[in-house]
């Protein structure tokens, strides 16, 4: 009977991070379970270049020092020379995290359950196979909740005529006017004729591809981009609430990624925070770490409740962007804002609805 040093359930970005950051320089035998075909996955992860992300600078595919936030009438441009906005593709991250000294065995199976068995864990897959490991890293998705917001998105990688895009400036949020939801277009210009164009919704409902494609096509036509070739696509749903998966009582069970509380729900940013989570686990040797400070979590909850209970067209985001400079804005998005920046953020929000949510 083979007993692995650790079992990773789900070989997405957080599972890959465990393999690289915690076990990459060891000779340990690790087993990972992934029931989907990740060989075709190639979405992009966006983040600002914080100190904890600098060790991965060599695999960054593009950096932007300028970004815009606005709508049809208003455009706010931010600049940060020290902490640019960056992207890493899933394939780059996967290749980087699989380049290790350890011995990783990948099983294309779905884990049905696991439980303590003697001094280790028995893992049972959907096809009734049994595996054993000393430690469990569980990254399985957090289920959507009725009445809670999600950030759901669909994007296409396109190739256009020359000099279509300003490759030195990304569109972080271009809000469109919708009847009852918050919607914006997000554009990553990788070159003058190649970009990811993404449609994103903050909503209690999940929208289908047809709806997203219409929003993308409407935006492209509005900007006279009528002829393009589609080179790829990506989609996803990110919960805009903190995971309520209980902290495991067993020190050898570790919840990671969104399941472990890595997501910053007010923004939907996950990738850089799950890396921070795994780094903290390695450095502290703890099975549960707090990624987001108490005040950040409190502000997130207030902001999300405001979005849930008030009709928001993007004006609050634009006003926020107008009252912060680039460095202040990225520090807010990455959970590193100073006390003075937090005061600016609070002063920017609509007073009466925001105060109601504080005492809600």
Range-by-range predicted roles:
Residues 14, 38, 142:
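Conserved Rossmann-like nucleotide-cofactor binding loop
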Residues 178, 182, 236-255, 264-265, ...:
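FAD-binding beta-loop-beta segment adjacent to the flavin cofactor pocket
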Residues 243-307:
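Conserved mid-domain beta->alpha element of the FAD-binding
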Residues 279-360:
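C-terminal helical "tail/cap" subdomain of flavin- and related membrane-associated enzymes
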Residues 1-14:
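Beta1/beta-strand and adjacent pyrophosphate-binding region of the FAD-binding site
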Residues 11, 100, 104-228, 241-245:
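Predominantly flavin-linked oxidoreductase catalytic cores and closely associated redox partners
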Residues 17, 21-74, 154, 158:
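N-terminal FAD cofactor-binding segment of flavoenzymes
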Residues 49-109, 114-119:
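A conserved beta-strand/loop capping segment in the N-terminal third of enzymes
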